[in-house]
Amino acid sequence: MIVPDLVADAMTAGPPAAKSGDGATMFGQVSDLGPGTVLAVETARDGVPTAWIAPTSLRAVVGMLREPAAALRMLFDLTAIDERQRAHRVGQPDCAFTLVCHFMALGGAGDALRLKVPLPAEAPRVPSIADFWPNANWYEREVWDLFGITFEGHPFLRRILTPPTWTGHPLRKDHYARATEMPPYSLTEDQEMAEQQALRFDPGAWGMARHSAHSDFMFLNLGPNHPSVHGVFRIVLQLEGERIVDAVPDIGFHHRGAEKMGERQSWHSFIPYTDRVDYLGGVMNNFPYVMAVEKLAGITVPPRAQMIRVMLAELFRVASHLVFYGTMTQDVGQLSPVFYMFSDRERVFEIIEAICGFRMHPAWFRIGGVAMDLPRGWDGLIRDFLDYLPPRLDEYEKMVMRNPIFRARTIGVGAYDVSEAIAWGVTGPGLRACGLEWDLRRKVPYSGYDQLEFDIPTAQNGDCYDRVRVHIAEIRQSLRIIRQCLDGMPAGAIKAEHRLTTPPPRARTMHDIETLIHHFLSVSWGPVIPPGEAHACVEATKGLNSYHLISDGGTMSYRTRIRTPSFPHLQMIPLISRGGMIADLIAIIGSIDFVMADVDR
């Protein structure tokens, strides 16, 4: 009797209307192609217009959306859904798998279009679109790796997140999710040799020549345990002397199935897992996840909780950018700054620990609000830090950004322009360093960012130096935002008065046996979220981070898609390193600002 009430309560808020702007224009372009191309139309709870198109029409539709390039349209994400166990599919074409392409227009207010392609259970296949959007290359490899969907015409369709010897496709519903579901593991000597052999790099398999007209090429493994690659990450370099001819990034060593875990945890208990994706981002990882759940549930977050979320997220942005700043200087040979900046980061963690109880991974956001109210004395801690850090940043400006050696190592190195950034799916500071003033907090404001005053730092050259400059300027803008949160923190509730708020406010749970049962079910089973799908995106520390969640009317997500900024950013390494030296590559890697858990999930 209780569970249906929870569902009915959440379903009172219908899906929002489709947005206008370039997203509607893209949708209109697709709709004009006629019924032979568009199989169905739907609007998800996030309001993103969605068109189902036939597999044979995919390239024609994508090619049309690619032009004109001046429209600043980005292939934001490409993923898939295993529909075979999904119960609620009203109005959707019958299929076993769905390919999902998410497009975003950066020329205006960030409007979006979602294309879906229905695919059969046996030998699902679609044509590759990597020649239209180069960032589709890795996304298509990921979909083939995890779902077994073949992309015809893809130049190098091979596993990317799982080992080359892996059997099966992990995000299919019939694939095991835990080691306890697998046979006991054993590794014979022959299997060990086969695993080692599978890791050997074959240049011919990647279309790489072994010789030039003048010399033999050397192939060098940089990583997976080199300190300059910032994690377990391998780049195979094709070298002529010390000059880089080409590079092949090899990722997946950190992959631990975060999206698969989302199908086994309750909506509430998955929150701590989000912290571990970008492990330097803390609650910034919670942000898009809880926003997506709140869209599905129809929850409106109180103003005080929204402001607290923004303040904590910006504190973590400062902490993450300080790590980037210090490690970047260390990568190019300066040893002192990293110690100063990590000391400053400790001050941020002292504030976060005082508010949240934990430092790096507080898992502090909740569905409908935050875990608890601000403690006594929080404002004094933050005010002291806001006075402390700006003079330190001034010192770092003299120490690092005006240093002639640092400038020589970074100016003009690893440069790309706006069109290349959009084609490769670059967002965040890496995009703004090219000169495009586009920040989701300003263009598509969420959680009250539209009530705050801040600038969008940009640069012009898109090189290593400018990427560092933008990060530094963003620290100052984050301090500006935090000060406004400090001075304008509203009074009121920290959780929404909604039956799907999890955990529910304690005042609502101690009245009688009925309210106690609601509390017990909400905490033990988790909230029952009504059927639907929703996408939520935030301007995270390294770029745009989004969650696309599908509910089938249960206590767990049917599909959890995590789109991280670091994944497409690393894909650009070959483009911006060709012709450079190995020392230049070290600076390029440091300037991208990534962590491998954010890449591999």
Swiss-Prot record:
Q: Where is the signal peptide?
A: none
Task: Show the catalytic activity.
Answer: a quinone + NADH + 5 H(+)(in) = a quinol + NAD(+) + 4 H(+)(out)
User: Gene3D superfamilies, from UniProt?
Assistant: Cytochrome-c3 Hydrogenase, chain B, NADH:ubiquinone oxidoreductase, 30kDa subunit
**In the UniProt record, which is one GO cellular component term?**
plasma membrane
**Which InterPro entries does the record cross-reference, listed alphabetically?**
NADH_DH_suCD, NADH_Q_OxRdtase_suD, NADH_quin_OxRdtase_su_C/D-like, NADH_UbQ_OxRdtase_30kDa_su, NADH_UbQ_OxRdtase_49kDa_CS, NADH_UbQ_OxRdtase_CS, NDH1_su_D/H, NiFe-Hase_large
Q: Give the molecular function GO annotations.
A: NAD binding; NADH dehydrogenase (ubiquinone) activity; NADH:ubiquinone reductase (non-electrogenic) activity; quinone binding
Matching Pfam families: Complex1_30kDa, Complex1_49kDa
- Report the sequence similarity comment from the record: In the N-terminal section; belongs to the complex I 30 kDa subunit family.
Q: How does it assemble?
A: NDH-1 is composed of 13 different subunits. Subunits NuoB, CD, E, F, and G constitute the peripheral sector of the complex.
Q: What is this protein called?
A: NADH-quinone oxidoreductase subunit C/D
- Species of origin reads Gluconacetobacter diazotrophicus (strain ATCC 49037 / DSM 5601 / CCUG 37298 / CIP 103539 / LMG 7603 / PAl5)
